[in-house]
Amino acid sequence: MSQGVTAPFARHAMAYVLAGGRGSRLMELTDWRAKPAVYFGGKSRIIDFALSNALNSGIRRIAVATQYKAHSLIRHLQRGWNFFRPERNESFDILPASQRVSEEMWYRGTADAVFQNIDIIESYDPKFIVLLAGDHVYKMDYEKMLQQHVEQGADVTVGCLEVPRAEATAFGVMHTDTTDRIISFLEKPADPPAMPGKADKSLVSMGIYVFETKFLLDELRRDAADPNSSHDFGKDIIPYIVKHGKAVAHHFDKSCRRSSSEAVSYWRDVGTVDAYWAANIDLTDIVPELDLYDREWPIWTYGEITPPAKFVHDKEGRRGEAVSSLVSGGCIISGASLRHSLLFTGVRVHSFSHVENTVVLPYADIGRSCRLKNVVIDAEVKLPAGLVVGEDPELDAKRFRRTENGICLITRAMIEKLDA
């Protein structure tokens, strides 16, 4: 056990969230916002899950490193995460890329995004750093990961989970021994190695790391001085520690926050339009795998002040109704029907429209007599009356972004082209 440090270890830790990525596979959803700032689940942004996990785990010092088109993200953090109090030894720092090392360099990689802020980390003097990706959806108790890190005397502890081999090319893939020590680590291999005894599975990194702060800062300084390094945790830092130190795997099953003992371990990289749509629509299930109603592990976010959702008209063929759907505050469903859909704040759906399997981001407006199926509608989009999407694949592909799985993404620019 670390000298002078007692449980709970989270009170001695700083959470450092990497939130600078674009997430280009989300296509036009990230044209004007970073991936961590993309809306999710009716009220939240994707980054709220990592931040809420840190807060619920007992961590009271948090820093968020931003870079790509950060305005939307920074505004959200300032509005929704401004309740930390220095007089209670709490802190919440937003760290935009600001050429702190030289005038020529922004953040050159994930490791450099921490290295350039070493002075800020040292000013708080945390015993541990919990390094997090800000673009995944999951619920996890980081205290349990910290406990394993201390008990096993690791130099780094890496959060991991099993995924199908076909999906593992997008992750760091590891092999472990019987004590969970990592003996090999490959970043995004073209042919991911399988787990022993599980030919169709690979053990992959979740992008969650625990370090003792002094060890991490020493490694970052070593890496920064290496002209051959890409200054990335997955490509450089972790493989180096696996070879020269002690890297340990922490299995997500051990710390996943579940709604019941029978529930599955839920983690999603909502990095494509298909995955994003599916993860949101999953929430309309009777018992979704991701429990947003757990009052003991809430997902904190900016709570915009809105009136309740409203459903009006009760005539045959013009009835405001929703079945198996999530409808946020400020929405008005005026003589329209929703099925298996998720509406964010302030959405308006006009009479005679039918919306199914659709995700509608804040303040979108769906005109009269629209028929929508398997759609993602970006924020503040105004759909014209009579628009039909999800019935003619060829026409959809000409007008909108249509994925391989048949999901259509609609943005304001696409609607403006229809009117041109």
Curated annotation (Swiss-Prot):
It holds the Pfam family NTP_transferase. It comes from the Bacteria. NCBIfam families: glgC (TIGR02091), PRK00725.1 (NF001947), PRK00844.1 (NF002023). GO terms for molecular function: ATP binding; glucose-1-phosphate adenylyltransferase activity. This is Glucose-1-phosphate adenylyltransferase. Transmembrane segments: none annotated. The lineage of its organism: Bacteria, Pseudomonadati, Pseudomonadota, Alphaproteobacteria, Hyphomicrobiales. The gene is glgC. SUPFAM superfamilies: Nucleotide-diphospho-sugar transferases (SSF53448), Trimeric LpxA-like enzymes (SSF51161). Pathway: Glycan biosynthesis; glycogen biosynthesis.
